A protein has these predicted regions:
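Glycine-rich beta-to-alpha transition loops that act as phosphate-gripper elements at the mouths
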Residues: 1, 19-23, 41-44, 67-69, ...
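Conserved beta-strand positions in the central sheet of alpha/beta enzyme cores
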Residues: 19, 37-38, 64, 108-110
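Catalytic-face loop-and-helix region of soluble metabolic enzyme cores
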Residues: 51, 61-86, 90-91
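Glycine-rich phosphate-binding active-site loops on the catalytic face of alpha/beta enzymes
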Residues: 67-70, 89-118
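Short beta-strand/loop segments at the ligand-binding rim of alpha/beta enzyme cores
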Residues: 14, 32-41, 78-88
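N-terminal active-site wall of soluble small-molecule enzyme domains
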Residues: 1-15, 23-32, 44-54, 71-73
Length: 118
């Protein structure tokens, strides 16, 4: 199913890439020369370790970590992986944006319109 979805997006939309939690979908999208963001929900240490191990086999263009309002964890992750990190989730104000960026995130993502206008 993931390969069908990626092919559909590539062939029938103007999408340049995908954001997904599924490593197999990242692999397929990369085969189709699409940009890829592999999203992780950092709930515990096991989720953190999954990022470290999967980055080498999946090769996403970016890794997005949620929640993004964890500068200490983002800093640690950015020193341990070579993939650019996007901080997302719970990014609600300038302080959380600056905290993530200062910690080493390449970018932040947010649905909060106030953050878009900073």
């Amino acid at each position: 199913p993931g390969s069908v979805c990626a092919a559909f997006l590539k062939n029938n939309t103007e999408a340049d890439g995908i954001i997904t939690t599924k490593p197999a979908l990242v692999r397929k999208a990369r085969e189709l020369s699409m940009y890829t963001v592999l999203r992780y929900f950092l709930l515990d240490s096991m989720a953190y370790e999954n990022i470290l191990s999967q980055q080498h086999s999946v090769h996403p263009d970016f890794i997005e970590v949620l929640p993004g309002a964890m500068p200490k964890v983002i800093h640690r992750l950015c020193t341990e992986i070579k993939v650019p990190v996007i901080a997302g989730g719970l990014i609600t104000d300038k302080e959380s944006v600056m905290g993530a960026l200062t910690a080493g995130a390449t970018a932040v993502s947010s649905t909060n319109h106030k953050v878009w206008n900073l």
